[in-house]
């Protein structure tokens, strides 16, 4: 069995996972209840709940408390072709109805983080992991 003590700092878990539903409206979204101030975030999945089978571009990225930020995009076109590329948003989703949602981390906060929506064209669920 692996030693899992590295996952805790001072007896408290140093990673936390969750998901957040983002509305189609502009603005910032504060996510709280993490239990610590994160120093990094990883978006591990996106889901367009209004059009669940039509995502053609999905990007999940990461950001640390410094300047490192990147996402990897997977494009799935209607002809079945799949392409990959990279971008600079923390998250990015584009569907077949031409709706786009993208955004970045605004701040790491005492009990979570705040996302800022660059474009908010659809309701989007994002799945994330944060750590310290």
Functional labels for PLM-detected ranges:
Residues 112-132:
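Short, structured beta-strand segments at or near domain termini in extracellular proteins/domains
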Residues 65-108:
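Contiguous ligand/interfacial binding patches
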Residues 35-39, 65-66, 107-112:
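Short, solvent-exposed coil/turn segments at beta-strand boundaries
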Residues 14-36, 46-64, 118-120:
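Surface-exposed ligand/attachment interfaces on beta-rich extracellular proteins
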Residues 1-19, 23, 129-132:
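Enriched but not universal
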Residues 37-43, 130:
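Short, structured motif recognition centered on aromatic/hydrophobic residues
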Residues 15-17, 110-113:
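Short, hydrophobic/aromatic-rich segments at coil-to-beta transitions
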């Amino acid at each position: 069995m692996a030693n899992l003590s590295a996952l805790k700092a001072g007896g408290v878990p140093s990673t936390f996972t969750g998901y957040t539903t983002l509305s189609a409206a502009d603005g910032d979204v504060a996510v709280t209840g993490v239990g610590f101030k994160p120093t990094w975030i990883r978006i591990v999945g996106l889901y367009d709940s209004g059009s669940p089978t039509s995502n053609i571009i999905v990007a999940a990225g990461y950001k640390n408390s410094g300047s490192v930020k990147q996402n990897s995009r997977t494009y799935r076109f209607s002809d079945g072709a799949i392409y990959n590329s990279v971008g600079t948003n923390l998250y990015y989703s584009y569907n077949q109805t031409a709706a786009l949602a993208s955004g970045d981390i605004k701040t790491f906060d005492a009990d979570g983080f705040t996302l800022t929506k660059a474009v908010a064209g659809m309701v989007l669920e994002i799945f994330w992991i944060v750590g310290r």
